[in-house]
A protein has these predicted regions:
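Conserved recognition-core residues within compact binding domains
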Residues: 1-74, 80-171, 175, 180-183
Protein backbone atom coordinates (compact mmCIF):
# COMPACT_ATOMS: atom_id res chain seq x y z
CA UNK A 1 0.00 0.00 0.00
CA UNK A 2 1.52 3.31 -1.05
CA UNK A 3 -1.16 5.63 0.32
CA UNK A 4 -2.41 8.82 -1.26
CA UNK A 5 -0.12 10.44 -3.82
CA UNK A 6 0.22 14.21 -4.35
CA UNK A 7 2.36 16.31 -6.71
CA UNK A 8 5.71 17.51 -5.39
CA UNK A 9 7.82 19.37 -8.00
CA UNK A 10 9.68 18.60 -11.26
CA UNK A 11 7.00 16.02 -12.08
CA UNK A 12 7.65 13.97 -8.94
CA UNK A 13 4.96 12.89 -6.51
CA UNK A 14 5.13 12.00 -2.83
CA UNK A 15 2.92 9.44 -1.10
CA UNK A 16 1.43 9.74 2.37
CA UNK A 17 3.56 6.80 3.54
CA UNK A 18 6.87 8.35 2.49
CA UNK A 19 7.58 7.07 -1.01
CA UNK A 20 8.72 9.38 -3.81
CA UNK A 21 7.36 8.60 -7.29
CA UNK A 22 9.28 9.55 -10.45
CA UNK A 23 7.51 11.18 -13.42
CA UNK A 24 7.57 7.77 -15.20
CA UNK A 25 5.66 6.16 -12.28
CA UNK A 26 8.54 4.22 -10.71
CA UNK A 27 9.80 4.81 -7.18
CA UNK A 28 12.89 6.82 -6.31
CA UNK A 29 15.57 4.84 -4.49
CA UNK A 30 16.01 6.08 -0.94
CA UNK A 31 19.21 5.98 1.07
CA UNK A 32 19.71 6.43 4.81
CA UNK A 33 22.04 9.13 6.11
CA UNK A 34 24.27 8.74 9.18
CA UNK A 35 21.49 9.97 11.49
CA UNK A 36 18.98 7.39 10.25
CA UNK A 37 16.88 9.69 8.05
CA UNK A 38 15.78 8.61 4.57
CA UNK A 39 16.97 10.87 1.78
CA UNK A 40 16.65 11.01 -2.00
CA UNK A 41 18.35 12.61 -4.98
CA UNK A 42 16.01 14.16 -7.57
CA UNK A 43 16.61 15.28 -11.14
CA UNK A 44 15.26 18.66 -12.22
CA UNK A 45 13.65 19.39 -15.60
CA UNK A 46 17.08 20.18 -17.11
CA UNK A 47 18.43 16.79 -16.06
CA UNK A 48 20.63 18.05 -13.21
CA UNK A 49 20.77 15.97 -10.04
CA UNK A 50 20.04 17.49 -6.65
CA UNK A 51 20.66 15.25 -3.66
CA UNK A 52 20.09 15.25 0.05
CA UNK A 53 16.33 15.84 0.09
CA UNK A 54 15.10 14.46 3.41
CA UNK A 55 12.01 12.35 2.78
CA UNK A 56 10.24 13.29 6.02
CA UNK A 57 10.49 16.98 5.09
CA UNK A 58 9.06 16.33 1.60
CA UNK A 59 6.15 14.33 3.08
CA UNK A 60 5.46 17.00 5.70
CA UNK A 61 5.69 19.78 3.09
CA UNK A 62 2.92 18.17 1.05
CA UNK A 63 0.72 16.39 3.63
CA UNK A 64 1.13 18.06 7.04
CA UNK A 65 -0.43 21.47 7.63
CA UNK A 66 2.06 23.90 9.13
CA UNK A 67 0.08 26.22 11.44
CA UNK A 68 2.96 28.69 11.82
CA UNK A 69 5.44 28.51 8.91
CA UNK A 70 7.18 31.59 10.29
CA UNK A 71 8.32 29.73 13.44
CA UNK A 72 7.65 25.99 12.86
CA UNK A 73 10.58 25.10 10.61
CA UNK A 74 11.52 21.60 11.76
CA UNK A 75 9.72 18.32 11.15
CA UNK A 76 9.43 16.01 14.15
CA UNK A 77 8.92 12.24 14.10
CA UNK A 78 6.32 11.76 16.83
CA UNK A 79 7.41 8.17 17.56
CA UNK A 80 11.13 9.18 17.49
CA UNK A 81 11.80 6.68 14.68
CA UNK A 82 13.55 8.49 11.80
CA UNK A 83 12.66 5.66 9.40
CA UNK A 84 8.89 6.12 9.90
CA UNK A 85 7.92 8.77 7.33
CA UNK A 86 4.16 8.22 7.33
CA UNK A 87 2.46 11.64 7.33
CA UNK A 88 0.46 10.88 10.50
CA UNK A 89 3.79 10.42 12.35
CA UNK A 90 5.11 13.87 11.37
CA UNK A 91 4.49 17.35 12.74
CA UNK A 92 5.98 20.82 12.30
CA UNK A 93 7.74 22.26 15.37
CA UNK A 94 10.24 24.87 16.47
CA UNK A 95 13.79 23.67 17.06
CA UNK A 96 13.41 23.90 20.84
CA UNK A 97 10.17 21.88 20.83
CA UNK A 98 11.74 19.31 18.51
CA UNK A 99 14.65 18.89 20.93
CA UNK A 100 12.18 18.04 23.71
CA UNK A 101 11.14 14.95 21.74
CA UNK A 102 14.67 13.65 21.23
CA UNK A 103 15.61 10.25 22.51
CA UNK A 104 15.73 9.90 26.25
CA UNK A 105 19.16 9.52 27.77
CA UNK A 106 20.43 6.01 27.27
CA UNK A 107 18.33 5.06 24.22
CA UNK A 108 19.51 5.43 20.64
CA UNK A 109 18.11 4.19 17.33
CA UNK A 110 20.50 2.09 15.22
CA UNK A 111 19.26 2.43 11.60
CA UNK A 112 21.52 -0.33 10.28
CA UNK A 113 19.82 -2.92 12.50
CA UNK A 114 16.46 -1.12 12.80
CA UNK A 115 16.65 -1.53 16.56
CA UNK A 116 16.88 0.62 19.67
CA UNK A 117 19.99 0.28 21.84
CA UNK A 118 19.81 0.78 25.60
CA UNK A 119 23.11 1.97 27.03
CA UNK A 120 24.28 2.94 30.51
CA UNK A 121 27.74 4.34 31.24
CA UNK A 122 29.09 3.18 27.87
CA UNK A 123 27.83 -0.37 28.46
CA UNK A 124 25.28 -1.71 25.99
CA UNK A 125 22.34 -3.19 27.86
CA UNK A 126 20.65 -4.69 24.80
CA UNK A 127 18.91 -4.08 21.49
CA UNK A 128 15.14 -3.75 21.28
CA UNK A 129 12.47 -3.50 18.61
CA UNK A 130 10.73 -0.54 20.24
CA UNK A 131 11.87 2.62 21.97
CA UNK A 132 9.65 1.83 24.96
CA UNK A 133 11.37 -1.53 25.59
CA UNK A 134 14.83 0.04 25.39
CA UNK A 135 13.87 2.91 27.67
CA UNK A 136 12.32 0.54 30.22
CA UNK A 137 15.53 -1.52 30.29
CA UNK A 138 17.63 1.62 30.72
CA UNK A 139 15.50 2.90 33.61
CA UNK A 140 15.58 -0.47 35.39
CA UNK A 141 19.36 -0.77 35.08
CA UNK A 142 19.88 2.83 36.15
CA UNK A 143 17.77 2.29 39.26
CA UNK A 144 19.65 -0.91 40.15
CA UNK A 145 23.00 0.81 39.67
CA UNK A 146 21.92 3.85 41.68
CA UNK A 147 20.56 1.72 44.53
CA UNK A 148 23.70 -0.44 44.73
CA UNK A 149 26.00 2.60 44.67
CA UNK A 150 23.84 4.35 47.24
CA UNK A 151 23.89 1.32 49.57
CA UNK A 152 27.65 1.06 49.19
CA UNK A 153 28.10 4.73 50.05
CA UNK A 154 25.87 4.38 53.13
CA UNK A 155 27.80 1.31 54.34
CA UNK A 156 31.15 3.04 53.84
CA UNK A 157 29.94 6.21 55.56
CA UNK A 158 29.76 4.57 58.99
CA UNK A 159 33.27 3.19 58.57
CA UNK A 160 34.76 6.47 57.29
CA UNK A 161 32.88 8.81 59.60
CA UNK A 162 35.84 9.73 61.83
CA UNK A 163 38.57 9.86 59.18
CA UNK A 164 39.95 13.37 58.55
CA UNK A 165 40.75 14.15 54.94
CA UNK A 166 42.88 17.24 54.35
CA UNK A 167 41.87 17.46 50.70
CA UNK A 168 38.18 17.62 51.60
CA UNK A 169 38.85 20.28 54.24
CA UNK A 170 40.81 22.31 51.70
CA UNK A 171 38.00 22.16 49.13
CA UNK A 172 35.30 23.01 51.64
CA UNK A 173 37.31 26.02 52.93
CA UNK A 174 37.94 27.16 49.35
CA UNK A 175 34.28 26.79 48.50
CA UNK A 176 33.28 28.85 51.53
CA UNK A 177 35.53 31.76 50.42
CA UNK A 178 34.58 31.62 46.74
CA UNK A 179 31.89 34.21 45.79
CA UNK A 180 30.90 32.11 42.77
CA UNK A 181 29.53 28.60 43.38
CA UNK A 182 32.53 26.88 41.82
CA UNK A 183 32.43 23.72 43.95
CA UNK A 184 29.43 21.58 44.57
Amino acid sequence: MIGESRPLFWGYEVTSCGLIVKPDGTFVTQSVNNKGYSQVALRNLDGQWFGGYLVHRLVAHVFVKNPRPDIFREVDHIDRNPANNVFSNLRWLTKSLNLLNTNAKGCHYIPKWKKWRAQLRRKTLGYFKTYEEAHECYLKQREELFNSEYRQLCENREHEKNIRRPSLIFFSETAARCPIPCFS
